[in-house]
Regions:
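Active-site-proximal cofactor/substrate-binding loop regions of enzyme domains
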Residues: 2-8, 28-31, 37-127
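A short beta-strand-loop-alpha-helix capping motif that often carries His-Thr
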Residues: 190-204, 237
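An anion-binding loop in the catalytic cleft
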Residues: 204, 209-276
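Donor/substrate-binding cores of folate-linked one-carbon enzymes
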Residues: 20, 78-196
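Amphipathic, non-transmembrane alpha-helical secondary structure
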Residues: 13, 17-20, 68-72, 174
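Short, histidine-centered active-site or binding-site loop motifs used for metal coordination
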Residues: 30-34, 148-151, 257
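N-terminal beta1-alpha1 ligand-phosphate binding loop
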Residues: 3-22, 33
């Protein structure tokens, strides 16, 4: 099967490797290099780096409709997507013979959109999952091919759950590609009431330590290790990396980053400021 893979973030890398082993991968489409780090140097996406290791041609289109015209004459069976970060226009979706399969880290139709992993943790969900869908022009509204439930461990952070879902999604993509090869790819409309997540903004990082302890802990988990929840303790802004609810029901800050002092335990921080 001739395929083109679309992806950008670290989440997509395991799926890219599955695509490379299950299809005749003709190229990888990713977002252009972006400034990163303190020096703001142009940095390739994780998917671009992985594509280089695989020796696969990389495309970095700025205008998707122009890109559709560029590749529209080539015979593709499948487009495969995981965490690409852009919606594909109709001009692209109509190119592949079978369609465009997308790996999404939630049990659709719940948590469509940009931040499904963070939403599941922030809301204190005990399970989430991964879904493979056939894309349409909407935001994660296409027909479902298959999905798999994934339990969320107590205290699990965004970084930990992200990595587990990336692997689970890649495994499920491999199963979907095997079914496609046999001509047995299932599909059904999404059922139930959907919900949509949006990209995170700076105000989403702020935590008020007067909130209920479980609410604070869930927000901290959803943002750890990066970008990290921000809180103000006696006039000083800190990044909270880990917290839990103690036996007495009170909030316990386990780890934080303090200005000019780096990473430390919550107890160390409070002692150092004479607050404990």
């Amino acid at each position: 099967m001739r395929a083109l893979f679309f992806g950008t973030s670290e989440f997509a890398v395991p799926s890219l490797r599955v695509a490379a082993s299950h299809t005749e991968l003709k190229g990888v489409v990713t977002q252009p290099d972006r400034p990163a780090g303190r020096g703001q140097r142009l940095t390739p996406s994780p998917v671009k780096r992985a594509a280089g290791e695989l020796g696969v041609r990389v495309y970095e289109p700025l205008r998707m409709r122009d890109f559709a015209r560029e590749i529209g004459r080539e015979p593709f069976d499948l487009f495969l997507l995981a965490s690409y970060g852009r919606i594909l226009p109709k001009e692209l979706l109509t190119i592949p013979r079978v369609g465009a399969l997308n790996v999404h880290p939630s049990l659709l139709p719940k948590y469509r959109g940009a931040t499904p992993i963070q939403a599941a943790l922030r809301n204190g969900d005990r399970e989430t999952g991964v879904s493979i869908m056939l894309m349409d022009e909407g935001l994660d509204t296409g027909d479902l091919v298959m999905s798999r439930r994934v339990a969320i461990a107590a205290g699990e952070t965004y970084g930990e759950l992200h990595d587990r879902l990336a692997l689970a999604g890649a495994e499920l993509l491999g199963e979907a590609l095997d079914l496609t090869e046999r001509g047995d790819l299932p599909r059904r409309a999404q059922r139930g009431e959907g919900s949509v997540t949006r990209p995170l903004a700076k105000e989403d990082f702020a935590v008020d330590l007067s909130w209920a302890p479980h609410r604070v802990v869930n927000l901290v988990r959803s943002l750890s290790p990066k970008p990290a929840a921000r809180a103000t303790i006696e006039g000083e802004s800190v990044k909270i990396l880990a917290a839990h609810v103690g036996d007495d029901g009170e909030l316990v800050i386990d780890e934080l980053i303090a200005p000019n002092r780096g990473r430390m335990s919550g107890a160390q921080y409070l002692r150092g400021r004479g607050l404990a």
